């Protein structure tokens, strides 16, 4: 953020009105390359999009000169007959403009966030809500709830709605026209909002920062209604959050909301007065849970569908919102199947000469690894078949033995690390068995031997590659409880870094 303020020395009262000229400034592309997703050093030699090019100041200057010409944005046209421009592939210039544009479009939000916290101090890190708050919620609050609304974030009916929403933050008409150009040029919004696993290479390599910003802004707009309802119905101080991209440190929360729809909601807010309504979200999926009745959740579902379609022009089909009763059905979230099951216990109460036997059922959080989708993913990656029988990896037989064992062991440890929050560890043992035997069959295939003789020759050292050092980690973090590490290995353990393993969250 300090870099951005150092480069952009302009009056803050005019920042949002003059964004378009920044597209012609060289330092914008230096910034984009500096703190972009690659995290590389500016002007350092690198390969972009698998082309043999160098990101240098000379290429940036050529790009700016080209944009000053009459038809400067024709370089973004993906014409297969003209693959080279000034000796470089045009996809390189397309990526550079997209990255620079993503930096510029973040400026109004970033500077407003900084200015809102000038002279203020954030006293407690707990106020910086994040995805990490999901795990305490599951442990402390989830077991006391009855129903859950499983919601897929709605998406705009038309791309023009994104531009209209940004007009409230950016008044530069030329910049908004350029935004329309990018939206219609790449046609990536549908693949992003529908959360498809197979996204095109253009989004993955060129426009990731730009379209993630648009998606975050879209989610921020769709979630603003919850802030409004919270303020109007409970009169409590509430804040909304907006996440900027590829930041490794927490930012504060933006205390900004446009008060709208006052007359529309005044007569129906009494329907939703539930002090135990909880909401959390990750990626394109959100959860609303409550201790209320099924009728209340049906009202919320009907209300949200009509609200998003009528007031926000979001396409939200009713089948994108499912009502689940936690006692009867598991919830698919963060790659886990989470549910609530009663844990019966018997208590003997002695009162003078009388004794009473009391049956108590305490709800307990049950997190299960989705074994069938997980085995399907492993079968797709050629570690096993659809029945869960391990198979060899012929494509890896050309690598040294140490590399093969390291690759298998690293994948196995990542999966075990991610699903350490499972309440049933037997599924993890089966996954470890698949990786262990698949590695053994791969090595046996390479050395033209049988699996039995190969395992006999390697001995117990082969198994150590696939055993996660969970006890060692716990003894390092909590040295006083190393004696009970065997008991802790059977308990549910949440690691905050599992949110970086995105592939395991989309197994369905």
From Swiss-Prot:
Biological process according to GO: mRNA processing; RNA splicing; tRNA processing
Chain segments annotated as coiled-coil in the UniProt record: none
Location in the cell: Plastid, Chloroplast
Keyword annotations from UniProtKB, A to Z: Chloroplast, mRNA processing, Plastid, RNA-binding, tRNA processing
Record flagged with keyword Cytoplasm: no
Cellular compartments per GO CC: chloroplast
Protein origin, superkingdom: Eukaryota
Gene Ontology MF terms: RNA binding
Role according to the record: Usually encoded in the trnK tRNA gene intron. Probably assists in splicing its own and other chloroplast group II introns.
Protein family per UniProt: Belongs to the intron maturase 2 family. MatK subfamily.
HAMAP family on file: MatK
Identification of the protein by name: Maturase K
Organism: Ranunculus lingua
């Amino acid at each position: 953020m300090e870099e951005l303020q150092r480069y952009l020395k302009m009056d803050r009262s005019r920042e949002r009105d003059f964004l378009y000229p920044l597209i012609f400034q060289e330092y914008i592309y230096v910034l984009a390359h500096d703190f972009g997703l690659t995290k590389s050093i500016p002007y350092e030699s690198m390969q972009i999009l698998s082309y043999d090019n160098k990101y240098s100041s000379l290429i940036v200057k050529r790009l700016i000169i080209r944009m000053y010409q009459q038809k400067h944005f024709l370089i973004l046209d993906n014409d297969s007959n003209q693959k080279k421009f000034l000796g470089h592939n045009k996809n390189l210039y397309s990526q550079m403009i997209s990255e620079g544009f993503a930096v510029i479009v973040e400026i109004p939000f970033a500077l407003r966030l900084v200015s809102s916290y000038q002279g203020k101090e954030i006293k407690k890190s707990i106020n910086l809500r994040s995805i990490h708050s999901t795990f305490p919620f599951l442990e402390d609050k989830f077991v006391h709830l009855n129903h859950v609304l499983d919601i897929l974030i709605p998406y705009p009916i038309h791309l023009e709605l994104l531009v209209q929403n940004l007009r409230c933050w950016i008044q530069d008409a030329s910049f908004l026209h350029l935004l329309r150009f990018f939206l219609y040029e790449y046609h990536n919004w549908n693949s992003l909002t529908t959360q498809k696993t197979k996204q095109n290479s253009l989004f993955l390599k060129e426009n990731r920062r730009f379209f993630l910003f648009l998606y975050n802004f879209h989610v921020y707009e769709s979630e603003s209604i919850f802030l409004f309802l919270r303020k109007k119905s409970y009169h409590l101080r509430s804040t909304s959050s907006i996440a900027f991209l590829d930041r490794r440190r927490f930012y504060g929360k933006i205390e900004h909301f446009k008060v709208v729809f006052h007359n529309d909601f005044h007569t129906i807010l009494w329907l939703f007065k539930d002090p135990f309504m909880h909401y959390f979200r990750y990626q394109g999926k959100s959860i609303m849970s409550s201790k209320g009745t099924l009728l209340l959740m049906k009202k919320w579902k009907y209300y949200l569908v009509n609200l998003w379609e009528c007031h926000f022009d979001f396409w939200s089909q009713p089948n994108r919102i499912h009502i689940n009763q936690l006692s009867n059905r598991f919830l698919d979230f963060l790659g886990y199947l989470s549910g609530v099951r009663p844990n019966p216990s018997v208590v003997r109460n002695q009162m003078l000469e009388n004794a009473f036997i009391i049956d108590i059922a305490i709800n307990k959080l049950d997190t299960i690894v989705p074994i069938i989708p997980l085995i399907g993913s492993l079968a797709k990656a050629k570690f096993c078949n659809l029945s869960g029988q391990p198979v060899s990896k012929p494509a890896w037989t050309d690598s040294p033995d140490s590399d093969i064992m390291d690759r298998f062991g690293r994948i196995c440890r990542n999966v075990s690390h991610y699903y350490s929050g499972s309440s049933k560890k037997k599924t993890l043992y089966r996954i470890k068995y698949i990786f262990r035997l698949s590695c053994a069959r791969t090595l046996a295939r390479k050395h033209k031997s049988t699996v039995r003789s190969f395992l006999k020759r390697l001995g117990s050292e082969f198994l150590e590659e696939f055993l996660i050092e969970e006890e060692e980690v716990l003894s390092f973090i909590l040295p006083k409880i190393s004696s009970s590490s065997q008991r802790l290995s059977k308990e549910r353990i949440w690691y905050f870094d599992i949110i970086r393993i995105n592939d395991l969250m989309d197994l369905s």
